Structure formats: structure tokens, C-alpha cells
Amino acid sequence: KALKICNVARDSMMLGIEKVKPGIHLGEIGKVIGTYVHSKNCSVVRDYCGHGIGEVFHELPQVIHYDDGKISQSPILEPGMTFTIEPMVNLGGYEVITSRIDGWTVTTKDRSLSAQTEHTILVTENGYEILTLRDEELNQ
């Protein structure tokens, strides 16, 4: 189960990345991620999202990892935009709770396993560049 959720998180992230190119709506990334995750009988956490990277570490735009029904209202990708794609995928439901003890630790509401993967993406003239790709990931 743990390996499955890790693979679904990674594979959904990569499918989202492969969608990146100038001229598409940002929401199209979330749609492809969410569709894949649901096809694997998993869910995408809705309380957290990817984000823009620039002068401030976490900035707009928010990168939603599911179809929120507002794709046409989402930003259109342009060369030079930099953001993260980082789906959090659960084996159970999408709801999460934050610890009352430390105010930081997050668990799934139904206590199911969860996994997250993340890359930082640069929109190029013809597609994308993965800025955080490690050498050992090149052949995966």
C-alpha cells in the first residue's frame, strides 16, 4: 500500500508536468492529476496546493491538483512562469486534519496513508524545464 501511494503521487505529478506549456490554463494540470489519481482509487488533498516561486517563496499562482470546475478561469501559462507541482495523494478520502498539539502535523481524517511529491517547474517557450530534477531521476 505504501509503495502504491508513493507511485501514484509521483506518476500523477509527472503527468501534470507533461501538460505544462505556454498557452494552457493552469487548471488543466490539476485536472490531469486528479483524473489519474481517481483512476487509481485514491484522492487528492484539497487543502494544500502548489504555488508560484519568485521574489517570495510561496506566491501566486496557486496550483490546484484536482479539477475545481474553474479551469477556464485559471491563469494562462506564459514563458518564464515558475511554480511547484506537488500533489498530496491519499489512499482514502481527501480530507485532512491539523494536530491540535503542535498546530503543524497534518494527517488524513480517515487515517489512510498519504504521499506527496514535488518539483519546481519553469515554463519555457516550447514547454517546460524541471528545475529540481536530480540525476538519479533522469531515467525513471
Task: Cite the ranges covered by each PLM segment.
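Active-site neighborhoods and metal-handling regions in enzymes and metal-associated proteins
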Residues: 1-140
